[in-house]
């Protein structure tokens, strides 16, 4: 990452799972990290102790997004990268107003990265050719669609499209790409039957874990040429 290594990497939703693994990966590389979190999981205390700057944020409103952006602007003169990992998962189901489901999914997956990319643009610029990055975390369902999570899939598709628009806007100083994962790791409460059904959906029949994501993120950060692209992490699921 060269001369920009002293600049922090911002990870939204960094308190658990993939976001947390990414935060520790960079900390272990002596790379400064800023993490947003909504709920104070015990892991946040560990990140703070290790030197990460952890900022509590509520992305459910635009005011909350902009308040977080203001905190970032106060805390650093530049950013090495923004990793938009914060996510929510809502299904269309009886009792859940459809307007609320759609608004929630669009707020976290579209409004939040859109507003943050604009608000923090000046922190990414001025560091040299292809010296900064934005990475959007989308989803495998962008390609396939989902009959049970229509609003979720639509919001992730919008984020995928924004990848190309921001790549055009911010080049050549900032590279903008997206990662579209399917199953990466299970939740602790997932039972054996569910796990096997999920594994059978891909050709590779495995949940690769966070390292697969970390390796791809590292590739995108070190590339000086790749921008405006989406990278599937689906184990060949599209061929099933």
Curated annotation (Swiss-Prot):
One of its GO terms (biological process) is one-carbon metabolic process. The keyword Oxidoreductase applies. Its EC number is 1.5.1.50, 1.5.1.3. It is an enzyme of class 1 (oxidoreductase). Keywords: NADP, One-carbon metabolism, Oxidoreductase. It holds the Pfam family adh_short_C2. InterPro entries: NAD(P)-bd_dom_sf, Sc_DH/Rdtase_CS, SDR_fam. GO terms for molecular function: dihydrofolate reductase activity. The active site is at 152 (proton acceptor). The keyword Secreted does not apply. It catalyses: (6S)-5,6,7,8-tetrahydrofolate + NADP(+) = 7,8-dihydrofolate + NADPH + H(+); 7,8-dihydromonapterin + NADPH + H(+) = 5,6,7,8-tetrahydromonapterin + NADP(+). Catalyzes the reduction of dihydromonapterin to tetrahydromonapterin. Also has lower activity with dihydrofolate. Belongs to the short-chain dehydrogenases/reductases (SDR) family. FolM subfamily. PANTHER family: DIHYDROMONAPTERIN REDUCTASE, OXIDOREDUCTASE, SHORT-CHAIN DEHYDROGENASE/REDUCTASE FAMILY (AFU_ORTHOLOGUE AFUA_5G02870). This is Dihydromonapterin reductase.
